[in-house]
Amino acid sequence: MENLLRPIYQERASHPNTLAVIMIERRNKTSSLTDNFDAALLVIVKDADEPVFIKHYEFDHQTASLHVVTDSQIQEWILLGTNRRIIDWIVNGRVLFDRNEYVVELIDRLNTFPFAERKLKIGLEYGKLIRRYVEGKAFFEANQFLDAYNAVVHALHHLARIEVIDRGFHPETTVWSQVRQMEPQVYKLYSELIESHESLEKRLELLFLANDFLIHSKAEIGSAHLFEVMKEKDIWQFGELLQHHDLKHFTQDLGVMLDYLTEKGLINVCQIETKGQAVYHRGYSFKKGVDSDS
């Protein structure tokens, strides 16, 4: 396969804009890692008009895909976890070209997993966990048990990823095999939801009780990034938090996250006067003493 792709990747490698070329070969008959192509070629570049550019090839009854991706897009995928297979590609792919040890340094950073990045990723997962939990509970109370089940499964996935990240690892596409070793309690919850012979309603009822406890127990690490921002000044309006540079990735889940933390008494709320009579802006402030740094 490499010989067939050589003209493609050598032409790309000759560009000064190219940082690395990595080949990922199909491992199984069904391969989500390569979208069922026989191989995927990842070309990482400094910059481009489009952050992601993809081409498909066919030759000698074999198929391959070419992915030209900017360095900034790679960093965003790693940070936000929005393309989980990218880590597998980088760590397990075959490096065909590596300018100035770009891939070596990238893998070293993945292995080191700086604390600030872990804190941000945990915060993002925590917001998604709360979102799915609230959605699931709403479905459950409306007797929409299948939709509630779907939401709870997603919530457990976010909880699983928090456990993995908190231990200094990046969540893999097979996150449950990681969690089984790292946090058997969370793995057991997932197994009971999937395998229990109880009625779906009963399974969900028990899961919501357990989830409520676990979400609250993760509040300190899950909110650490948000609390760090909120310490910058005494009172915040929601729009101010939303526009803060360090919270730009929280936009979708920040509202539900603040509501949950307020309900649990971890954030203070105050009223800020408006021009309207008896109408107030809601102000949020960090409640001192809720984290270990205070």
Swiss-Prot record:
Pfam families cross-referenced by the UniProt entry: HTH_52, NTF-like, YgxA-like_sub_bind
Domain of life where this protein originates: Bacteria
Name of the molecule in the record: Uncharacterized protein YgxA
